[in-house]
Amino acid sequence: MAINIRKTHPLLKIMNHALIDLPAPSNISLWWNFGSLLGLCLIIQILTGLFLAMHYTADISMAFSSVVHICRDVNYGWLIRNIHANGASLFFICVYLHIARGLYYGSYLYKETWNIGVILLFLLMATAFVGYVLPWGQMSFWGATVITNLLSAFPYIGNMLVQWIWGGFSVDNATLTRFFAFHFLLPFLILALTVIHLLFLHETGSNNPLGINSDADKISFHPYFSYKDLLGFFVMIFLLATLALFTPNLLGDAENFIPANPLVTPPHIKPEWYFLFAYAILRSIPNKLGGVLALLFSIFILMLVPLLHTSKQRSIIFRPLTQIFFWFLVANSIILTWIGGQPVEQPFIMVGQIASISYFSLFLIIMPFTSWCENKILSLN
């Protein structure tokens, strides 16, 4: 009998267990495609970023000009930059859908996998933030100034911390240089953590829409789910190409076409769209330190979700009351995203404050209490 090399070779064996002979539940839906799509996004971002880094100059006098040079003079530089900028947006769309899937189907009960995922989200946000500073446009400069300034809210060490991150007394050349270094380094850290994320996932196996044990009904990952993922790849590449070729500046800010000027403040300082929900929560609290803590907690609250699971069922597919509040949470997050892009005036301030309270209430009180109520209703039958 011929020896199958993929099952015996030390390197190929790892790939085989992860991508070919991996036992997968037979009933996982399209919602389980986003993990592989995130892997594709990461590869696209690393490759396009590498080519951009070859032509970019991390100096405040040349950064803006070097981006212009990439778009005008480098072969297909405009395309690489558009793919990289819009690829980030698609990355975050996939991340948020991936998290929503995890919340809906109870995937967060794989605690190690879930918590590493939350750390990955935090690193992804940090990477996107430092990357947004690199073109050195108006919004890059002022965004960096405002967000890094938030660290001054921490007692005693705040001002020292801000100056340490800036490398001086204002956002300057030292800041840009270190942000470029971080932006180059962090994606590789994300890549390493992704491998650990997968390692923990493959220890338990994937969850499924029913939220029940699927050991009795599993099929191999290849060819079934490899081809299913391939369809997702084509759809995502088509969307990315459409965005990058037809409306490359749709999700960007017009202010960033103006070179950074420390003497002129833009009328509305706001981050990229994928940070607006957290930015709205930050702005809705009048106290600076309170706002910073709420901003951090808006992401790290996801780590509390496994601890707040009170239901006897894993998935919320059979829990209509919790389903209602889950969709409230989705709508609430969309409202926060909209509020984050609006000026700081009434009625936006009030709506933002109500949406912020709702966001934390749904996670900490309403959904756990609803699950507990559903348990009581089930026990009555």
Swiss-Prot record:
On whether Heme is a keyword of this UniProt record, the answer is yes
Residues the record lists as binding a ubiquinone = 202
Q: Where in the cell is it found?
A: Mitochondrion inner membrane
Q: Which PROSITE patterns match?
A: CYTB_CTER (PS51003), CYTB_NTER (PS51002)
The record, for Pfam families, names:
Cytochrom_B_C, Cytochrome_B
Biological process (GO), any one: mitochondrial electron transport, ubiquinol to cytochrome c
Q: What does this protein do?
A: Component of the ubiquinol-cytochrome c reductase complex (complex III or cytochrome b-c1 complex) that is part of the mitochondrial respiratory chain. The b-c1 complex mediates electron transfer from ubiquinol to cytochrome c. Contributes to the generation of a proton gradient across the mitochondrial membrane that is then used for ATP synthesis.
Q: How does it assemble?
A: The cytochrome bc1 complex contains 3 respiratory subunits (MT-CYB, CYC1 and UQCRFS1), 2 core proteins (UQCRC1 and UQCRC2) and probably 6 low-molecular weight proteins.
Q: Which family does it belong to?
A: Belongs to the cytochrome b family.
Would you tell me the protein name for this molecule? Cytochrome b
Which species?
Answer: Negaprion brevirostris
